Amino acid sequence: MKLNVSFPATGAQKTFEVMDDHKLRHFYDKRMGAEITADHLGDEWKGYVFKIAGGNDKQGFPMKQGVLTNTRVRLLLKKGHSCYRPRRTGERKRKSVRGCIVDQNLSALALIVVKKGEKDIPGLTDTTVPRRLGPKRASNIRKLYNLTKEDDVRQFVVKRPLPEKDGKKARTKAPKIQRLITPVVLQRKRHRLAIKKRRVESRKEAEAEYMKILHLRRRQERIRRRSRLSSMRDSRSSVGEERDKEKEKAAAKAAKKVAKKEAKKEVKKVTEAAKKADAKAKTKAEPKKAEKKAETGKKTAGDKKEKKVEKKAAPAVAKKEAPKRKPEAAKGDASAAKKEKKQKKK
């Protein structure tokens, strides 16, 4: 198994090939990120502490942190996941990765020196590999040279020498410092703040104007609602008055009808009482009339007999006189006579 050991203090890294399983078994069943002593690798590694950074199996599949197994699995990976670099935006792909637990099937194991031991390792701790580029951010440059905010960062930029050309001066290349505070940056900041302030003020004015219009509209709506309610109330009252008038008229008509009926009843009672009184008076006056009629009848009969006797005694020479009409009996007398006959029969 190959051990890729890196030393961040000098920036150097070196590969060591270890074939003895007795030396490697101390790494087995350890997970990525675990720290382990390197004393078992030999006396030159005494006091060194390693941190397991990763590795590859014999087929070249990388170890992935968080996959708690010592075998190979297929995971659906997307942008931001380790062991995968998307070729298109939003692309996802199922890739084979190895678990984060170390075993004997690995071909290479990446280790980081966390603590340096007693002895130097040749090619790892005794050599320094300078960085090709220096820090670019202003805060990192200040941190590297322990500068304050008042110091000018531009004088401490790490410059890179360019290859010399024939007959020309040596040139250097310096990176553009990012997050460097200059008068232009401060001016832009003031401009942004002024725009923001103006935007806030305009928003407040627009809000005040809107609230003013809203209060006006609400007031108009309240007035409109009140007028509508009052008109509805008036219409209801007018309708109620009409209904009351109609009811009063209907009640007056009903009272008139009742009064007429009562008057008719009283008239009927009076007429019936008068009829009864007339009938009683008639019943009392009927026998007197009958007696008078009987007397008058007797007189008329005697007169008729006398006239007959006179006719017989008259001479034949005498002129014939026109016959006199018999006096007709009064209708009341005839009816009285009929009533008497009926009473006699009874």
Curated annotation (Swiss-Prot):
Keywords on record: Phosphoprotein, Ribonucleoprotein, Ribosomal protein
Modifications the protein undergoes after translation, according to the UniProt entry: Ribosomal protein S6 is the major substrate of protein kinases in eukaryote ribosomes.
Family membership: Belongs to the eukaryotic ribosomal protein eS6 family.
Coiled coil, from the record: none
Gene that specifies this protein: RpS6
An example molecular function term from Gene Ontology annotations: structural constituent of ribosome
Pfam families for this protein: Ribosomal_S6e (PF01092)
PROSITE patterns documented for this protein: RIBOSOMAL_S6E
The organism of origin for this protein: Aedes aegypti
GO CC terms in record: ribonucleoprotein complex; ribosome
Source organism, top-level taxon: Eukaryota
Protein task: Component of the 40S small ribosomal subunit. Plays an important role in controlling cell growth and proliferation through the selective translation of particular classes of mRNA.
Disulfide bonding pattern of the chain: none
GO biological process: translation
Composition skew (Basic and acidic residues), residue ranges: 231-251, 260-331
Region described as Disordered: 224-346
Protein name as catalogued: Small ribosomal subunit protein eS6
SMART domains per the UniProt record, alphabetical: Ribosomal_S6e (SM01405)
